[in-house]
Amino acid sequence: MLQIPQNYIHTRSTPFWNKQTAPAGIFERHLDKGTRPGVYPRLSVMHGAVKYLGYADEHSAEPDQVILIEAGQFAVFPPEKWHNIEAMTDDTYFNIDFFVAPEVLMEGAQQRKVIHNGK
C-alpha cells in the first residue's frame, strides 16, 4: 500500500460525504488540485465502500489501478494520477484528507507573499 511520507503535513479535510452530498465531479475521471505534485490524498470510508479507479492518463480506456476501500479502511492515492471513485453502496459515507510536502507549502507561502506584497 502506498504510504504518505512521514514529513508531509496534513493541510485539509473534506466534509464527510455520501452519494448525494459529494461533488458530482468526484465520480468522474479527473485530475484535480488535490493531486498536484507533492500532495497525497487519503480517502477514509466510515460506512459502505468506495472503489478508486486510477488511470495512466486522461484517455486510457481501462484503469491501471483499482482499490476497494471498505468501512473502517482508508487508502492513499498517488499525486498527479487521473482517477475517479465509485460509491459502492447507497449508504456509503466517506471523506478525503490531503497531505502536502513541506516544500510545496513553502512555495505556496512565497507565492502568496508576492501576490499580497502591496506592490
Curated annotation (Swiss-Prot):
S-S bridge residues: none
Pfam families xref list: DUF1971
InterPro entries named in the record: DUF1971, RmlC-like_jellyroll, Tellurite-R_YeaR
Protein name: Uncharacterized protein YeaR
Native species: Escherichia coli (strain K12)
Highest classification ranks of the organism: Bacteria, Pseudomonadati, Pseudomonadota, Gammaproteobacteria, Enterobacterales
This protein's encoding gene: yeaR
